[in-house]
Amino acid sequence: MWPQYIGHTANAPLLRRPPEPGLDLGVFFLQHDHSGGEGWTWARRLLRRRGVGPQVGDGALGQRLRDFVSRSVTFAMPNRKAAYELTHIIFYLSDYGRQIPELPDGTLKSLHFTGLLAFLDQDMDLLAEVCAALRFSGNYPSPLWEDAIAAYHRALRVQAEPDAPMQDDYHEFLVTGWAMKIADRSSLAQTMPQGALRFHASRSGQGALRPLAACLNDMGAQRRADWGYMRPHVLSYLGPDSHAILLAAERSGPHFEQFFEGFARARA
């Protein structure tokens, strides 16, 4: 959940429950979130802003969060729900960058694995969250990742459109601009039109994640978890754009070989 919503009260009719003046969203989520996951964490953060209850990282819930973020093997495979839970947990534990959280071993690797998946897929929304989470945890993202986010954000176009659809690229605009702000980079400078707006991102190609997965699938039982062995096979399989993205991912940080070992799901 985004910081602009924190402190809001619940809209009872929208939530389809009897009116209850001043119902805080944190209380609502504590009452209605049964996953035992991010909803509870977010609710605890909201309540702490009112001076109620324990800190986000305290007790059994805090331990559960730390156990989750430290299981880096979870984040070597595409799982958007788990990926966003990871970044949001770091946001909450760091109080959105107000403090450096004490994180267990494995957390940094979890963030890097998630960032590699996002970069390979050219998913700039998720990659921006990973970069923000890395900075909030006291680490620096790969400059290649932040350069990609900056280029994506600056290519976004905002235009007035009376019948603008609800589903557009606003969230990508928001989170990539936010990540650039955290990194002290200048964000999109353009005059916002009046009225209903449409946010449009310029996308090219499909990234390298799907071609990489297709290559491994085509190799079947012959694929290996050893990136050194697999590298020439994979690179010869990919097209020019995917090839370039994969090479950039490989040099973006120190964890690519370990990431590939988990992603390949093959014997060493």
Placement of each model-derived feature along the sequence:
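Terminal, non-catalytic domain-edge segments
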Residues: 31, 142-268
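Eukaryote-skewed repeat-based solenoidal scaffolds used as protein-protein interaction platforms
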Residues: 1-158
